[in-house]
């Protein structure tokens, strides 16, 4: 199992694509709520084909079921009294607001089941942390009181024109990794150096947008719960509630355009979260677009591109030898067959074996080389996450003055929670076809898929492939569209070629040169360039 552990943390990691259908209603796999012993009993009682898959899995990876737990242990925490916070927004109060419709009939001001949610808000004093002095900041928790879930967020106003600039929600992936990683390691207003000093980031995405960094799902980062979330659809309900209550507290931001951006496993999150928002007719969330960077969205189409990327066909020298490349080729047909079965059933009993087999067969050979799965140009620096700098962030966030300034309620901060990662994996969420939600988004708003071209785990070859095979009304035109040079247009680097872009209607794909899994880390100037231009509406129908 250790052959693919790292890939399941920060990242995620041309097939014939069957006719795409909307993502099915969540499958009820009740056995997953049982103790592990009962789960094994359930496997024994399954049908022959499914049992064979699990038997083969157990034979190939004998420690798998013993090593993995299905639920995350609650994080130690102490909830602060309401008096600690500047504002507490009650979901029940928001749900109780009725307004007159255009037809003269009364309806709720905002839709959704909100009565069990609260939002706690406090102003963050930038002078105490040394981050973006003069920029208004808020932090706090979204509380799901019925299910004992508490999601932490940190909001930064735009450095430029917060009264008019758009608002962006940023999501890191994993699943199970804190979005504060994105804040301090990629696109936020500051980074942390080896001496735990705060370093200003001139290329922060809040240069021309206000940004919310959210630790989700629960038990990630500063978030905590007595329960657990183990699939993307369930997490989407929490995000809708957070945004609804946040914009109710701050109506000045609700007037601005709103966008959702993220990377890696956010390729699952964002189609589901955006679809959840759009499903509510009466809402105060002015969603205008979504951006997915180096995401895992359509595994069936993306997994065949691990071998080319590892074997020198993605624009960089080969990492693997010919023997390993042939081994991946040989394993691919079975991997694809298992993913196809997962797409058909969306059951954990089918999707979990597909995840474990394919990750070991298609990602494992690369990982065993010690090369960075997030950047084919480098070796892993430190531990499973490959970047020593992540340790500095964790150390800084675990300082008591920092936690006090933010109102954090957990005893300690971790950049990634492996239990959450395993929960999603062992509930079958990893391989599910969330790309089937994307056509519905394209009909209503612009969708950007961008990819740093040095990433292995969610590489640009696979992302380009799934965008070109996606079933939607403009598929043929998008697939045949030319990849054009993407150059910087409005600063001292004007004319610099930073990548390639193709677009048709509301759908756009970008390849960013020299970027790894985390494009803003490797190419900060280029990332801010395309981000600002995207928010400005340069690529849309």
Curated annotation (Swiss-Prot):
Organism of provenance: Uncinocarpus reesii (strain UAMH 1704)
Membership in a protein family: Belongs to the peptidase S10 family.
Residues making up the signal peptide according to the UniProt record: 1-17
SUPFAM superfamilies named in the record: alpha/beta-Hydrolases
Any one GO cellular component localisation term in the record: fungal-type vacuole
Organism lineage string: Eukaryota, Fungi, Dikarya, Ascomycota, Pezizomycotina
Task performed by this protein: Vacuolar carboxypeptidase involved in degradation of small peptides. Digests preferentially peptides containing an aliphatic or hydrophobic residue in P1' position, as well as methionine, leucine or phenylalanine in P1 position of ester substrate.
Class of enzymatic activity (EC top level): hydrolase
One BP annotation, GO: proteolysis
Protein name as annotated: Carboxypeptidase Y homolog A
PROSITE patterns xrefs: CARBOXYPEPT_SER_SER
Disulfide bonds listed in the record: 177-416, 311-325, 335-358, 342-351, 380-386
Active site: residue positions: 264, 455, 517
EC number: 3.4.16.5
GO molecular function annotation: serine-type carboxypeptidase activity
